[in-house]
């Protein structure tokens, strides 16, 4: 297993820098290392299901931990923003969020049958004119031209069928997932297109009014969030 010293872990990891000298790194996958946590760290340090890697490998090999409804058996599997972790044996479900300091944290959910929120990062035209939607968690699904980049989708799990389409537009509710306003939620009041190499910006009104770059904004609902926010934070 590939490891790194705990003092060098990415800032987005909420795992403390004390205790174990070495932590496992994430394997290349649906999320970058900077924006994900290894499944092994989650089940050992956060959920405290196991005491060591050997125990972790055993419960994963037995299919006791699901990510987005699929059993994952790799301690280094990357778990990122809005991913859903389910523990069927104890009927517990968690969603990965990002706090105001940009750190990833698990929120415990009351329901076990939950949906997944994803942002459309890109669109690809396939042979025959079919449109493929490339989502922020690495998922690729077939769609149509009614969907635009930066729109969000609510997907059922584990089949990832589109349940609802949320447009990236003024008036919709959004969460900021980067920069100094990370973790804040508010209504989009303006989308400012910059005709240069600089980033487009988005004005948001929440507890305060602020502006952030477009890439940091993910639509989470229209009048209300389409995914449950809050809940017990597991640290």
From Swiss-Prot:
This is Small ribosomal subunit protein eS4. Keywords: Ribonucleoprotein, Ribosomal protein, RNA-binding, rRNA-binding. One of its GO terms (biological process) is translation. The keyword Mitochondrion does not apply. GO terms for molecular function: rRNA binding; structural constituent of ribosome. One of its GO terms (cellular component) is cytosolic small ribosomal subunit. Belongs to the eukaryotic ribosomal protein eS4 family. Residues 37-100 form the S4 RNA-binding domain. CDD domains: KOW_RPS4. PANTHER family: 30S/40S RIBOSOMAL PROTEIN S4, SMALL RIBOSOMAL SUBUNIT PROTEIN ES4. The keyword rRNA-binding applies. HAMAP family: Ribosomal_eS4. It comes from the Archaea. Pfam families: Ribosomal_S4e (PF00900), RS4NT (PF08071).
């Amino acid at each position: 297993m590939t490891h790194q010293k705990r003092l060098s872990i990415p800032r987005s990891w909420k795992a403390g820098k004390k205790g174990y000298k070495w932590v496992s790194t994430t394997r290349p996958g649906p999320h970058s290392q900077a924006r994900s946590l290894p499944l092994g760290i989650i089940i050992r340090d956060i959920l405290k299901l196991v005491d060591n890697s050997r125990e972790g490998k055993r419960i994963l090999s037995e299919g006791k931990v699901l990510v987005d409804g699929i059993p994952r058996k790799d301690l280094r599997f990357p778990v990122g923003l809005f991913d859903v972790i389910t523990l069927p044996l104890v009927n517990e479900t968690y969603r990965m969020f990002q706090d105001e300091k940009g750190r990833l944290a698990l929120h415990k959910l009351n329901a076990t049958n939950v949906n997944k929120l994803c942002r459309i990062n890109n669109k690809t035209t396939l042979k025959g004119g079919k449109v493929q939607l490339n989502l922020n968690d690495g998922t690729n699904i077939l769609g149509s031209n009614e969907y635009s980049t930066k729109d969000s989708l609510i997907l059922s799990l584990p089949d990832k069928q589109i349940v609802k389409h949320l447009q990236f537009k003024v008036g919709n509710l959004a969460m900021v997932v980067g920069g100094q306003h990370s973790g804040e939620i508010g209504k989009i009041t303006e989308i400012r297109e910059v005709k240069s190499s600089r980033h487009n910006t988005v004005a948001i009104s929440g507890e305060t009014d602020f502006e952030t770059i477009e890439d940091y904004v993910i639509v989470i609902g229209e009048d209300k969030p389409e995914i449950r926010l809050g809940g017990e934070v597991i640290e």
